[in-house]
A protein has these predicted regions:
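Phosphate- and other anionic-substrate recognition elements at nucleic-acid/protein interfaces
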Residues: 1-151
Length: 151
């Protein structure tokens, strides 16, 4: 199973994971909607042709330290306009009750290595992706993230 997760924003985080091969790719797409559209025009058809499940953070606009940024809403609206099936994750679902923390990702070997992490949005996208797999009860992912203690 291949899953693509999107953490939309001015710098959009992307995580692509293949549960069979354990292939993981993380990206940052700068320049908001324009950058994401450019990225999608190149990679989107590849995702759709390869039966990739798409997961995206739903977004509730709230004012942050730098004011109100509606870039995520623009990206979500554009994705909805494509008519592509998307599984929506609320922001607070990504942690699944703190089950998918950076420490858990590191223990599972999924946290980006030093120098590979460009923005926290990559990790947020990965957390959305894994929260989706836990939600659908993908057993190998659950066991990878939370192996039973050795007896």
């Amino acid at each position: 199973m291949r899953v693509l997760a999107i953490d939309p924003g001015a710098k959009t985080g992307i995580a692509l994971y293949d549960t069979d091969t354990k292939f993981l790719a993380l990206e940052i797409i700068p320049k908001g909607l324009e950058g994401f559209q450019r990225w999608w025009s190149f990679k989107g058809p590849l995702m759709l042709d390869n039966s990739v499940t798409i997961v995206c953070e739903s977004f509730e606009a709230e004012e942050g330290t730098h004011g109100l940024d509606l870039t995520p809403v623009e990206i979500i609206g554009w994705l909805k306009g494509l008519g592509v099936p998307i599984h929506w994750q609320r922001r607070n679902q990504r942690g699944k009750g703190k089950l998918i923390t950076p420490a858990v990702l590191k223990r599972a070997g999924l946290y980006p290595k030093r120098g590979e992490l460009k923005e926290g949005h990559q990790v947020a996208a990965l957390q959305h992706l894994l929260a989706y797999l836990v939600k659908i009860r993908h057993r190998p992912t659950i066991e990878l993230l939370h192996p039973k203690e050795a007896s």
